[in-house]
Amino acid sequence: MVPSSTVDSPAKTSINQVRNKDDYLEQMDILNKQKVDMDDPRLISLIRNYWIENPSDQPYNLNKPQVLDPSIGQAAFADNRLNFKKGGFFVECGALDGETRSNTLIFERLRSWNGLLIEADPSNYKLVKKKNRKAFTINACLSVYPYPVK
């Protein structure tokens, strides 16, 4: 997943070849200090290649697999409003453990949706990964700023 080339722009510093975790963390620090735009190709490349993790290909490891909708009703409401759509894409911000009160697990399991689970807390993120969700995951937070912050 190492980019084969760097992204160059006359007004921007290019990303150096990323070889390991320290390299991409260093590159992220550089982009953070520059307060690059959220759609900067260098930032997008680092996030895609080094932060977002692929969906699990292992069986689910849920605490309560018999509970189809752990969202306490929100997902059922959305499912109805979306006319029980199959094959959609979701973004869940604040995935917690990937199961408890999840608004997206029902879409993933019953409607064949894919998506992105975002969880900022490293401890909870480890729990998300243990659930073997069939969605992309990222251990990151959202920001009110239009540039990356640490």
Where do the PLM segments sit?
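Phosphate/nucleotide-binding beta-alpha loop and adjacent structural elements of enzyme active sites
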Residues: M1-K150
